[in-house]
Swiss-Prot record:
URED, UREF and UREG may form a complex that acts as a GTP-hydrolysis-dependent molecular chaperone, activating the urease apoprotein. This is Urease accessory protein D. It comes from Oryza sativa subsp. indica (Rice). HAMAP family: UreD (MF_01384). Signal peptide: none annotated. Required for the maturation and activation of urease via the functional incorporation of the urease nickel metallocenter. PANTHER family: UREASE ACCESSORY PROTEIN D (PTHR33643:SF1). InterPro entries: UreD. Keywords: Chaperone, Nickel insertion. It comes from the Eukaryota. GO terms for biological process: protein maturation.
Length: 306
């Protein structure tokens, strides 16, 4: 029954990728996609010495229209390294008849393998409805990087948190047992709009790091985030000293980026960082800095400066 279900899921998928070792290098041995998804596996991406495979997921027309359902499976073989990214933000267009735009990704990461899912953000247009689910199957020595993030919309044009519905679910299963379960939901309310709740912030992001190869990146990110936030959230002091009666601002300026890190799993083998920021570029800078240490594994830095 499980085999039949897997075959049925594969048949319904709009995309399927398999990465295996070929002559000592990670290579894409299967790459299938159909409308509205397009997958590109460039032969040259990053330094050849890294031996990693790269994939670009693209939608026709640069976005997902109302009612579209994109379903993709990824299998990263034992000892392989693969990165899956995009060429620009994923645009989600206005919902028609309240139909959601959906994306589903199911990835299996082999033993001693590395899979990095490092897309650009999702940008939902006014009145859009979007739902995505990502499921990752791992082993105790698998290595996984997941960046899941979205923006308020075309906020530079004044369109800010005007979409109707956004939901993102991430599950990590360790040998088919739940290791990490996360869900983010933003929905317009009659009492408070999304814009009311998010105030001046325009970006929400989550970064998951799991596996023995990524422990040093976890430790560095946790240390630097702790230092950054201790400075940004430190109460302001006046020139008059600790006991000065000089008035402080009633509404102190909020920091342009807020981040936190939390371990998960047995012995803290995984870490999740959560970020919210005023600008997309500040999150790009955060990701570029903290994920630069992936270059030896992937042959290139994620989110390079344009």
């Amino acid at each position: 029954m499980e085999a039949e279900a897997a075959m049925a899921a594969a048949a319904a998928a709009t995309g399927a990728v398999r990465v295996e070792k070929v002559r000592g290098r990670s290579a894409v041995t299967r790459c299938f996609a159909k409308y509205p998804l397009k997958l590109i596996a460039p032969s040259k991406a990053g330094r050849a010495s890294s031996g990693a495979a790269w994939l670009y997921a693209i939608t026709y027309g640069g976005g997902i229209v109302s009612g579209d359902i994109i379903s993709c499976t990824v299998a990263v073989g034992d000892g392989c390294a693969a990165a899956m990214t995009t060429q620009a933000s994923t645009k989600v267009y206005k919902a028609v008849d309240s139909k959601c735009s959906e994306q589903v990704l199911e990835a299996r990461v082999g033993e001693d393998a590395l899979f990095a899912l490092i897309p650009d953000p999702v940008t939902c247009f006014s009145m859009a409805r979007y739902h995505q689910k990502q499921v990752f199957h791992v082993f105790p020595n698998s290595n996984l990087v997941v960046v899941d993030w979205f923006t308020s919309g075309r906020y530079e044009s004044g369109e800010k948190w005007n979409f109707s519905f956004y939901k993102s679910i991430n599950h990590i299963l360790l040998e088919d047992q739940p290791l990490f379960i996360d869900s983010v939901l933003l929905e317009q309310s009659s009492n408070f709009s999304i814009a009311d709740r998010m105030q001046e912030y325009n970006v929400v992001a989550m970064v998951i790091l799991l596996g023995p190869k990524l422990k040093h990146i976890q430790d560095q990110m946790q240390d630097e985030v702790k230092k950054m936030m201790s400075v940004q959230l430190r109460p302001p002091t006046s020139a008059g000293g600790r006991y000065s009666t000089r008035s402080q601002p009633l509404h102190p300026q909020r920091p342009p980026i807020i981040a936190s890190c939390s371990p998960f799993g047995r012995m803290g083998t995984g870490m999740v960082a959560r970020i919210t920021a005023v600008s997309t570029e500040s999150v790009y800078s955060f990701l570029r800095h903290h994920l630069a240490a992936l270059e030896p594994f992937l042959g290139a830095c994620p989110y390079p400066a344009s």
